[in-house]
């Protein structure tokens, strides 16, 4: 592919402008004879996870295609599954710009996007138009102006709307960019949320005559005790899977680099080791009682294999994909 040249041009632009431009072009070629420019053939390597059959174990992590605008394009590149979102009940513009920064020397990104999205109804319309043959995950969150105490209502609204169209639903309680959101990972707040989500899942299962698994996405910045408590809650509430991890607030690996002081969540290579360690600790705690989807800094075949060796059943990429391009999908799926 021509990605090194494309990347050079895109990296001259503001990161958010580069993202918009890329999505414009992907929408332009998808479903036309020009789709060959992005299509890659990858081997089928089926994986069974959460009761679903995945074509291969590599997925696109949430956050890149928040509104489900380019699902078919990412499918054409060879992803076994695509996770869209995070989406909220109502549209919201997110935090003030600039809010996305490349840490080029470290192959990392810092973002404080703040769940900018066009709302769950718009996402559902985009999903209905897509023809992706893989598993579609839909990642849901709460609106910024919804008080944390009422946050679970936002998740239940989104579940209602996405359930008929989702392969699985991801519950995002770990973004550092929505005030108070991470507090939902702890103690009674977590138990209350998970109980409500399982009740809603049961209700929707009966209504739609299909079972859509639910996975919870957690942060990397957790103490041993917090991780043990989260694992215990996930098991007690019969949650179907856990996605580990979201972005980190830790900056120790990027000290002195451009933009290192910017607020927001850090992803990419600087997150690689810490997210793998969370997966390893989580796997020891869970003992196979629910599967782990590993994400955080995967930028090579070896990084993907490390996540799986630590206990992940599936893996996802985002920042590594920005820095390495579609070839990374092929490299991982071919040899994982």
From Swiss-Prot:
Q: What is this protein called?
A: Dihydroorotate dehydrogenase (quinone)
Q: Does the keyword Oxidoreductase apply?
A: yes
Q: Which cofactor does this sequence's record say it needs? A: FMN
| Residues annotated as the enzyme's active site | 175 (nucleophile)
**Any note on cofactor binding?**
Binds 1 FMN per subunit.
What pathway is it annotated to?
Pyrimidine metabolism; UMP biosynthesis via de novo pathway; orotate from (S)-dihydroorotate (quinone route): step 1/1
Chief subcellular location = membrane
